UniProtKB/Swiss-Prot annotation:
It comes from the Eukaryota. One of its GO terms (cellular component) is mitochondrial inner membrane. Binds 2 heme b groups non-covalently. InterPro entries: Cyt_b/b6_C, Cyt_b/b6_C_sf, Cyt_b/b6_N, Cytb/b6-like_sf, Cytochrome_b, Cytochrome_b_C_euk/bac, Cytochrome_b_N_euk/bac, Di-haem_cyt_TM. It is found in: Mitochondrion inner membrane. It comes from Thomasomys gracilis. Its cofactor is heme b. This is Cytochrome b. A ubiquinone binds at H201.
Amino acid sequence: MTIMRXKHPLLKLINHSLIDLPAPSNISSWWNFGSLLGICLMIQILTGLFLAMHYTSDTTTAFSSVAHICRDVNYGWLIRYLHANGASMFFICLFIHVGRGIYYGSYTLLETWNIGIILLFTTMATAFVGYVLPWGQMSFWGATVITNLLSAIPYIGNTLVEWIWGGFSVDKATLTRFFAFHFILPFIITALVLVHLLFLHETGSNNPSGLNSNSDKIPFHPYYTIKDLLGILLLLMVLMILVLFFPDILGDPDNYTPANPLNTPAHIKPEWYFLFAYAILRSIPNKLGGVLALILSILILAAFPLLNSSKQHSLIYRPITQSLYWIFIANLLVLTWIGGQPVEYPFTTIGQISSVLYFTIIIVLMPMAGMIENKILKLY
């Protein structure tokens, strides 16, 4: 069997990626989230496939078809809630995965990092078009508000919006194409994941110390397969608690009302995992400025390798940058909270302060802290 897995073209590929892969001996549980994201993606594709068998992408029947899935299809409620809450688990793992990358300096692996940013954008696009499909109030108005942002693009904005809508408002054509996008994007994500792994295995994994670990590697199997398995079991446990006890805790009650173009909900807001970006968007009074800030809030991740001023790889021995990092995380949570609040004082002011702080920490304070730490440690 050993010879077989080392010689067979297909098994050789799996062997070099998951079995005989040399891995650093000291990677912590923060490195588990990559495999957890893979499991989340598999759960989403499988549950999504079964949902697509019963869903109809027509404005008159979309809402009813989701109700039909929950009421009449065998374990349809379970599949639907696994898919909805699976998306939340996906984003929790994504944010932790990116946060780990920032903390331990994984952004120095340029190709892997940049493919990761593209993956983040693609996943966000998938989640957005997916949220429109149940055709509830928040689905409809969320789609209307977010697609309308493209009208801020000078000269071609309005034409672009109508082209995406397939008409003069969010309607049947929009729903049908969003369903098509939602179906195809996870497979594009899967392809990108393989590219992400390809680039990662070119350089090898980073590790908590930030030092070169080539002299101290261990095989991925059995050490990290068993470790990943524990992570997967914990993830599934949390997901099942969510699905079976609190299936609607992360959703919006407005989405249980069928879409009505004549009745606007009091507070239009996206799913919780977009709230931080939504808060940044709302904190700028100008439409185009808001859209640019929204895109930059994610695209700023690409600037991390450029803004890195420290001679050390990881934040583990950098107390000043470490403090800034945790302030940044706290600020991100504040933005998430603000995104779900109505547009009124004091929320708007808090949102504006947090948005400025979000960009200031990344662009100004962290590079400065890196330079100060270099000076203190005499690392010129």
